[in-house]
């Protein structure tokens, strides 16, 4: 969830890095917790949405309240930009927006469209500030109890499903965007490259606060940044 850790508008590069050694290292960190990480699945770039002013710079968040998942990273992100972070569960999100408990939120375009958040939000901002990912997990004891041929079949099926899901998302994304663009009273727009650079320049305090105390996290984030910069 670290803002602007992932490359802007470049899914192919994200896939290459997370399907490779660095993604495997992250999955290996899950070992010993009772579950195995089988793969990292793409869920789309997150948008900012608000029911207030347009967002073109970090300063535009001043005075806003933004719903977040219970997450120190997301809380630090919005507080760094001068907004109040309002933790709320996914099931509560629509009512939180409808009742004005929070001015806005962040989610991928398909989550916004399928849950009709465009009915209670007026600004939809493609910011490329973050990417939603999901990790497919298997119970370790169950997985290790399987014969080798079944383990191999599951691993192959996960890889196939992960890649097919990416294709399906890409095929549907334009339709979801069209749903938002055509919604009454909704303004959908993308940040300009110049605006994105201003946001990128603002987030270093978030990185420092969220990786402090963990040499592995600091090193891993640095290696991800280097890989995405290639």
Residue ranges and their predicted role:
Residues 1-13, 22, 30-230:
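N-terminal secretory/targeting leader peptides
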């Amino acid at each position: 969830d670290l803002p602007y850790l992932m490359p802007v508008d470049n899914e192919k590069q994200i896939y290459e890095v997370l399907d490779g050694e660095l993604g495997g290292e992250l999955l290996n960190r899950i070992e010993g917790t009772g579950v195995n990480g089988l793969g990292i699945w793409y869920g789309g770039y997150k948008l900012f949405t608000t029911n207030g002013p347009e967002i073109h710079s970090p300063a535009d968040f001043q005075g806003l309240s933004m719903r977040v998942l219970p997450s120190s990273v997301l809380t630090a992100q919005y507080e760094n930009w001068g907004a109040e972070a309002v933790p709320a569960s996914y099931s509560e999100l629509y009512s939180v927006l409808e009742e004005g408990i929070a001015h806005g939120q962040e989610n991928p375009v398909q989550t916004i469209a399928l849950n009709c958040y465009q009915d209670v939000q007026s600004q939809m901002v493609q910011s490329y500030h973050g990417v939603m990912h999901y990790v497919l997990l298997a119970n370790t004891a169950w997985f290790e109890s399987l014969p080798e041929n079944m383990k191999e079949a599951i691993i192959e099926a996960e890889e196939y499903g992960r890649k097919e899901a990416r294709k399906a998302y890409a095929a549907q994304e334009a339709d979801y965007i069209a749903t938002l663009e055509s919604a009454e009273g909704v303004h959908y727009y993308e940040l300009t490259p110049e605006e994105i650079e201003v946001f990128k320049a603002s987030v270093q305090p978030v990185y420092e606060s969220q990786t402090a105390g963990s040499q592995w996290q600091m090193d891993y984030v640095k290696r991800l940044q280097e890989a995405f910069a290639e």
